[in-house]
């Protein structure tokens, strides 16, 4: 959300089902969308007067879950196709793997998903994927931080000693309230 605002987005939506994360998104100036209250696509289309967003970003990856907590690796991608306008762009930074032997469905086990390619094609959307090339952005981001225009530290909820790492991972993995991002300090 913060990056989208820095890049000039006039309105940013954050879809989640954890109240603490939605609160943080609102504090950053984004519009929080609670996917447990109502379908996220419907909320976004309503807030954009049926037009959809110019761009969407998939940040969850293959471990996405539906509102009942069941893994559904296709959910965010298909929701983005539905909520992004025709000719809009979709960025995928969430991790997708070539194989997931522990997955519940056969497609997911093969690293595949049921993707709404028909709607994607009909709308003329574009997808970009992969890890960010941080070397391209780090100098500019450092300048933005230095001049007070970017503050990525605002999403950090805990700064802990390295020895506290195992306990921190348990809280983070369990999605305990208030555990958004953790920084482990080896020298502390």
Where are these regions (language model features)?
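Short beta-strand element of Class I
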Residues: 10-13
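Aromatic pocket-lining residues of Rossmann-like dinucleotide-binding sites
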Residues: 4
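Glycine-rich cofactor phosphate-binding loops and adjacent beta1-alpha1 units
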Residues: 7, 23, 28-124
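Rossmann-like dinucleotide-binding domain for NAD(H)/NADP(H)
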Residues: 120-121, 127-128, 144
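Generic secondary-structure boundary/loop-capping signal
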Residues: 57, 92, 112, 117, ...
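C-terminal hydrophobic helical "lid"/dimerization subdomain
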Residues: 38, 68, 131-188
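Conserved SAM/SAH-binding beta-strand->alpha-helix loop
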Residues: 18
């Amino acid at each position: 959300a913060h990056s989208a605002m820095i890049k000039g987005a006039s309105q940013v939506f954050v879809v989640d089902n954890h109240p603490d994360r939605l609160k943080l998104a609102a504090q950053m100036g984004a519009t929080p969308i609670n996917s447990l209250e109502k379908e996220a696509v419907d909320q976004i289309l309503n807030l954009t007067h049926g037009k959809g967003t110019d761009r969407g970003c998939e940040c969850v990856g293959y471990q996405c879950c539906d509102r009942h907590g069941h893994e559904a690796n296709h959910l965010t991608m298909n929701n983005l196709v539905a909520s992004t306008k025709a000719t809009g762009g979709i960025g995928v930074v969430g991790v997708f793997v070539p194989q997931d032997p522990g997955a519940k469905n056969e497609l997911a086990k093969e690293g595949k998903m049921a993707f709404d390619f028909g709607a994607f094609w009909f709308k003329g959307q574009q997808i970009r994927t992969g890890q960010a090339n941080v070397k391209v952005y780090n100098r500019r981001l450092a300048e933005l931080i230095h001049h007070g225009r970017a503050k990525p530290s605002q999403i950090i909820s805990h700064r802990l000693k390295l020895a506290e790492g195992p306990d921190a991972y348990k809280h983070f993995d369990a999605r305990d309230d208030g555990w958004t991002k953790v920084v482990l300090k080896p020298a502390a």
